[in-house]
Amino acid sequence: MEEQIEISIRDFNQNDLNFILSKWLKNYKFSSRFTKKIKADIFYKWHHMIVQNILGRNTANVLIANPIDEPDVNLGFICYEKGDAKVLHYVFVKPEFRNFGIGKRLYHAAMGDNSTAFFTHWTYPVDTLEVKVPNLTYDPYRI
């Protein structure tokens, strides 16, 4: 059983934007099989625009995990959409806070039950997530 730490989960605000962009881009660049093969200048230019596009949608939501007593300290986030279908775009938890159940709690806060959902960014941790969430389907075209 994984150890848990007390966190609060809140909606993101504009003060969180740099954290979200930097962690999403840097982490995805080095945690995906195919992005490692893209030259950094090409990846950061184009994927930054993709992330900005996702965040700018009316249907996009971002939740932030913080220590319960430190609302300005970000431990991680999840970006998702709930519309005709549930779409998970990205989950990030700072490495030193992984294996405390933060990602799982963000996922359940955002996506609810284990009903059918899609995800758009394949990273190495998704390999284990697919086993835990069998109704999760990779669909990069929902970006």
Model feature map: region roles:
Residues 6-22:
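A short beta-loop-alpha structural element at the N-terminal edge
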Residues 93-113:
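Conserved acetyl-CoA-binding loop-helix of GNAT-fold acetyltransferases
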Residues 54-59, 81, 112-114:
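Flexible, charged surface loops at secondary-structure boundaries
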Residues 85-90, 112-143:
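Conserved GNAT acetyl-CoA-binding A-motif
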